[in-house]
């Protein structure tokens, strides 16, 4: 410690010395008077101090209470009660009084012993090193986390699982078809094994850089999107060791209480859809529990003035918002309109009608709104309940809304007539205003923008060929044949978009403008990111027609993916399908394992594997069983009754 410096003499007040000869007698008399005065002052101060000290002494009863407070609380002292017959006489006396005093003494001894034990434990803690204390704290934290996991993973009330048909099988009799199916399985194994090695736990994989990849739709957290998305594909293909690896990761690591902003739409179709499908296929309770946990985290997104959910929600805070690029802060039709299948199953499995009410509210609101030319615009403001920009598309921003109207009807065992009517009305408007034929005879689905038709079709819109075929049965005015043919025409157009490229892989979108047909013009539209929609349409049309061309076209696509997208670390998209020397984008999308490879595998499987009269595939290709109940009331669900 530094010694403080002495104050300089010039800074002190020192009275000057009088060095002249004193007048001695006068000086003594003055001193005597001063001494008496000082003594009197001291005496007065002493008396005042004593009196004040006596006056301000603490109340002895309060001091006693403070000193014995613990004993007063823990040891009931025996006093004469106010209501006693003889005041001043103890109520407890004789042997009872003696026994009470013994108990009181034992209690005092116990308090002293506990106090000494606590002191010893405190001393022991102080003697431990900082590392030991940290280790103990971490152990306690781990214990609390484990207890929370046990509580979170508590089984939900049992609900009868629908009759599940065709979760195994599909072995083709033809050797050539069997070999092709095995090749698709090997491609799945290559994609999964490399993700397992280089991207495990991350949402997706960068197969060239050989590291994890997390797009912003899943937020900043490692939620294992590829694991959840691929589970049912692994199960269907009989890759059970890989399935168990994924299941263990989900049990130990999948946590939704993270400070991460995610897309409500994407986590619904990929995570909730994937977990529900894995539950129905395997019967493992953990998948149902995790699906419900995530669904609860999505519910705050519906806290808007209209009940139309936000596009994004923070899983921890529940704060929602919409995409900055969306028209006037709007929600997207294909996003808030693609929740029905998963939410109906959540209500079925939990008995909680909240999920059912959320999606039915969206449906009722849409039914009341005016629709220009009978078409649903892609943008709806969740604050005002008004349409945004008048842009209608069966491709991106609109696609799966129409798909889920049809599939809501199918999933209800064709009893949700309201959904079927909405689908039929929408398809009639689409056919009237959006579906056109090119000069070369190709049927395409354009986009309606601000009163005019843009003659451009996106890869995402190619799913519609399968949708038209799937919805043919039950269509109005006995038009089943018409819609099956319309689906086939869309499939042919999308196949042409593949066949007119150098890689035999389709671009992201393609135009029909003059001499240009089914070809991408802009560089940003020439990429292929392992999308499934064309192969999805091939599979549906194969199931309904058994026309061999769909297997042939599917195999062409599989060979092109194998040749141009396969790399040592997995599969990657390509940036230009018109270049014979493509550049890879270095992303293995989770939907490649969930959809593209699953549809290829089913294309070369028998119809008894996941038959369409028992299963409905969500927009991420996760199969959910048909519920044989009226989904407008869920009256057939014992959990609800």
From Swiss-Prot:
Its cofactor is Ca(2+). The chain crosses the membrane at residues 37-57. GO terms for biological process: carbohydrate metabolic process; ERAD pathway; Golgi apparatus mannose trimming; lung alveolus development; N-glycan processing; protein glycosylation; respiratory gaseous exchange by respiratory system. The active site is at 508 (proton donor). Disulfide bonds join 462-494. Keywords: Acetylation, Calcium, Disulfide bond, Glycoprotein, Glycosidase, Golgi apparatus, Hydrolase, Membrane, Metal-binding, Signal-anchor, Transmembrane, Transmembrane helix. Its EC number is 3.2.1.113. Glycans are attached at residue 631. Ca(2+) binds at residue 619. Coiled coil: none annotated. It is found in: Golgi apparatus membrane. InterPro entries: 6hp_glycosidase-like_sf (IPR012341), Glyco_hydro_47 (IPR001382), Glycosyl_Hydrolase_47 (IPR050749), Seven-hairpin_glycosidases (IPR036026). One of its GO terms (cellular component) is Golgi membrane. It catalyses: N(4)-(alpha-D-Man-(1->2)-alpha-D-Man-(1->2)-alpha-D-Man-(1->3)-[alpha-D-Man-(1->2)-alpha-D-Man-(1->3)-[alpha-D-Man-(1->2)-alpha-D-Man-(1->6)]-alpha-D-Man-(1->6)]-beta-D-Man-(1->4)-beta-D-GlcNAc-(1->4)-beta-D-GlcNAc)-L-asparaginyl-[protein] (N-glucan mannose isomer 9A1,2,3B1,2,3) + 4 H2O = N(4)-(alpha-D-Man-(1->3)-[alpha-D-Man-(1->3)-[alpha-D-Man-(1->6)]-alpha-D-Man-(1->6)]-beta-D-Man-(1->4)-beta-D-GlcNAc-(1->4)-beta-D-GlcNAc)-L-asparaginyl-[protein] (N-glucan mannose isomer 5A1,2) + 4 beta-D-mannose; N(4)-(alpha-D-Man-(1->2)-alpha-D-Man-(1->2)-alpha-D-Man-(1->3)-[alpha-D-Man-(1->3)-[alpha-D-Man-(1->2)-alpha-D-Man-(1->6)]-alpha-D-Man-(1->6)]-beta-D-Man-(1->4)-beta-D-GlcNAc-(1->4)-beta-D-GlcNAc)-L-asparaginyl-[protein] (N-glucan mannose isomer 8A1,2,3B1,3) + 3 H2O = N(4)-(alpha-D-Man-(1->3)-[alpha-D-Man-(1->3)-[alpha-D-Man-(1->6)]-alpha-D-Man-(1->6)]-beta-D-Man-(1->4)-beta-D-GlcNAc-(1->4)-beta-D-GlcNAc)-L-asparaginyl-[protein] (N-glucan mannose isomer 5A1,2) + 3 beta-D-mannose. Residues 2-36 are cytoplasmic. It holds the Pfam family Glyco_hydro_47. It is a single-pass type II membrane protein. Highest levels of expression in placenta and testis. It is an enzyme of class 3 (hydrolase). Pathway: Protein modification; protein glycosylation. The modification N-acetylthreonine is found at residue 2. Involved in the maturation of Asn-linked oligosaccharides. Progressively trim alpha-1,2-linked mannose residues from Man(9)GlcNAc(2) to produce Man(5)GlcNAc(2). This is Mannosyl-oligosaccharide 1,2-alpha-mannosidase IB. It comes from Homo sapiens (Human). The gene is MAN1A2.
